[in-house]
Curated annotation (Swiss-Prot):
Phylogenetic placement of the source organism: Bacteria, Pseudomonadati, Pseudomonadota, Gammaproteobacteria, Vibrionales
Catalytic activity: (2S)-4-acetamido-2-aminobutanoate = L-ectoine + H2O
The protein, known as: L-ectoine synthase
Function: Catalyzes the circularization of gamma-N-acetyl-alpha,gamma-diaminobutyric acid (ADABA) to ectoine (1,4,5,6-tetrahydro-2-methyl-4-pyrimidine carboxylic acid), which is an excellent osmoprotectant.
Family per similarity comment: Belongs to the ectoine synthase family.
Stored CDD domains: cupin_EctC (cd06978)
The organism of origin for this protein: Vibrio parahaemolyticus serotype O3:K6 (strain RIMD 2210633)
Length: 128
């Protein structure tokens, strides 16, 4: 059994900080569960281009407000209780509204190793 707290993970190398977001990676590839689990904060008033070409992701909004815009498609509002699933490697823009920092619970398949950040194309690399 694996038991971890958000606080202990936040105060370790499992916390990764980027320009528009920070992510506490609570479950990673080395845990051998077949997926990874993160609590990610999207900073207020930001827009992040993301295109997970190597991963599928499901995201549940726990707090805050924003929107997700699928490139070439629709824009969907995000608020607490919203789940969105990137089941087609959807290229998108994630926006947190001003004064509405979003806290999200995220699941990735395949799992990430922990140190990944988006490259210039919004992609996480696939690491064996």
């Amino acid at each position: 059994m694996i038991v971890r707290t958000l606080d202990e993970c936040r105060n370790s190398e499992r916390r990764v900080v980027a320009d528009n977001w920070e992510s506490v990676r609570m479950l990673l590839k080395d845990d051998n569960m077949g997926f990874s689990f993160h609590i990610t904060t999207i900073y207020e008033g930001t827009e992040t281009h993301i295109h997970y070409q190597n991963h599928l992701e499901s995201v549940f909004c726990m707090s805050g407000e924003g929107e997700i815009e699928v490139v070439g498609g629709e824009t969907y509002p995000i608020k607490p209780g919203t789940l969105y699933i990137l089941d087609k490697h959807d290229e998108h823009y994630l926006r947190a509204y001003k004064n509405k920092e979003m806290v999200m619970a995220c699941v990735f398949n395949p799992p990430i190793t922990g140190a990944e950040v988006h490259d210039e194309n919004g992609v996480y690399p696939l690491v064996d």
